[in-house]
Amino acid sequence: SGGTDSIVMAVKAARDYARAKHGLTGGLNIIAPSSVHPAFDKAGMMMDIEVRRIPVKDYLADVEAMEAAIDEHTLMLVGSAPCFPFGLIDPIEKLGKLAQKRVLWLHVDACVGGYIAPFVRMNGVDLPKFDFSVPGVSSISGDLHKYGYASKGASTVFFRTKEMRDFMHFDAGPWPLGRMVTPTLAGTRPGGAIAAAWAITQYLGVDGYREKQREVVAARETIAKGDRDLGFQVLGEPQLGIIAFTHPEHDPLRIYTELMKRGWFTAALIEPRALHLMLSPKHNEVAAQYLADLNEARATIREESIPSYAGTI
């Protein structure tokens, strides 16, 4: 399965939990920052749940604005650790307090960060809390096929209690063969991805993951410093493996096009317009070359922006 499946199953569990424990029916909604993954919209479409995307503040979840959007039909709050567009960890501790205050399910989407953040923290980086150490967090999704380095698709979803997890299960009957119970929507799932995920976790172990994630952070730090030295502005203060940056004078999408000409096939943000990198351990080896090409791309755009007065008086 992928991160979408983990998120969909967390939403399904939260919905059924809200029905059973709080009597919520019909017209349900989820309150989330605008930076959350579209998988929540998929879940909302499938289950007829409104997803209210609240504008972010300084690229992070705006907890006060999210609280203002809550009503009697709200079943879930969402935060990311980190969000995919900006690579920033939302203020999960504040969201946890809000979830407790309003008696709501809080899901943390750590599909990107779930298997890098713990090892980055072990390596001495002071990361914000986002896991079950935060009171109020009900469920967490994390992808092994991202920074767990497993084959696609291998995602996981965790619940604070067994009771909460049980609401994820599909339990159907009556049927001529009796009850049919599956942990997810899929009746049949391939075992190859599970075996591959087990193999890579056994092969790397804690020490292996710490070293891999150290290289990721080193690549991000090198690129962040280089970006700033070249006049780019990094969006927020990323601490993991994703970084987004813009330029105050030049269109980042034009720079992105120039980088593609030089063989860099990365990503870009549309709102705000920015360059976007999701870094791996190998990128630490090519960070200097990337910055050199970024500088060339910026210079090319700058020269094209200067009007020519040749042949004029």
Descriptions of predicted regions:
Residues 10, 55-59, 65-66, 77-78, ...:
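Pyridoxal 5′-phosphate
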Residues 62-107:
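Active-site phosphate-binding strand-loop segment of PLP-dependent enzymes
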Residues 1-7, 32-34, 236, 269:
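Active-site nucleophile and cofactor-binding loops and adjacent substrate-binding regions
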Residues 122-239, 245-249, 313:
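Active-site C-terminal subdomain of aminotransferase-like
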Residues 1-23, 40-43:
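Conserved beta-loop-alpha segment that forms the PLP phosphate-binding cup at the N-terminus of a helix
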Residues 209-213, 217-224, 228-230, 236-313:
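Non-catalytic terminal extensions of PLP-dependent enzymes
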Residues 19-73:
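PLP-dependent aminotransferase-like
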